[in-house]
Regions:
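Non-ligating segments of multi-cofactor redox enzymes
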Residues: 1-194
Length: 194
């Protein structure tokens, strides 16, 4: 088999059903009017609940700021009509920003060309995780590019259950500490009476 180079960018997919947004207890992660998902740094408490809620692993925690960070789809730029920095800087024109319908039409046409040449090409992002705002035209299977074949967005119920489990564990810890202190005070009183 012949070896070949395959390239792909990897950043936030701005999921239509964003697990990170659903998991954030302070609502620091929001969807803008243009559909991109951003972290409001002034509201983020650094709890990291969003990190395991992202099936793509593209959210990181900054020890320096104590908050999470991810691609904003160049929120400031797109709200000023400038497009994304990555699409402007891409030397091959492979990364594009624009109207979703136009981009899908271009991708579908290119996919048809690649398939006609016998390529194993596919579009990733139309159906994955209930649809992504960022999609890819891959020349091979998604896992070759480091993407999950069948990404699953954690259900809100699971995130809530995790939170309940954490709170229950904290409650048990506090109860054990109170019990220990009461027992310790009880033994001190016995020693004083003797």
């Amino acid at each position: 088999s012949q070896k070949r180079w395959l390239f792909s960018s990897d950043s936030c997919k701005h999921c239509k059903d964003a697990g990170c947004l659903n998991a954030c207890p302070t609502k620091a992660i929001v969807r803008t009017d243009l559909g991109n998902v951003i972290v409001q740094q002034d509201t983020c408490i650094g709890c990291k609940f969003c990190i395991p809620s992202c099936p793509y692993g593209v959210i990181s925690f900054s020890e320096q700021s104590g908050t999470v960070h991810k691609c904003t789809l160049c929120n400031d730029r797109i709200h000023n009509g400038l497009g994304t920095a990555c699409s402007k800087a891409c030397p091959t024109g492979s990364i594009r920003y624009g109207e979703l319908g136009d981009l899908k039409n271009r991708a579908d046409a290119r996919l048809a060309q690649l398939k006609a040449r016998g390529e194993r090409a596919q579009i990733y992002g139309y159906r994955e995780a209930d649809g992504l705002q960022v999609f890819y035209l891959f020349a091979d299977l998604p896992h070759i590019y480091g993407q999950p074949e069948n990404p699953v967005v954690p259900q809100r119920r699971l995130v809530l259950c995790s939170l309940v489990t954490i709170l229950a564990a904290l409650g048990i810890g506090v109860a054990a500490l109170v019990n220990f202190r009461e027992r310790l005070q009880g033994t001190e009183e016995v020693h004083h009476e003797s």
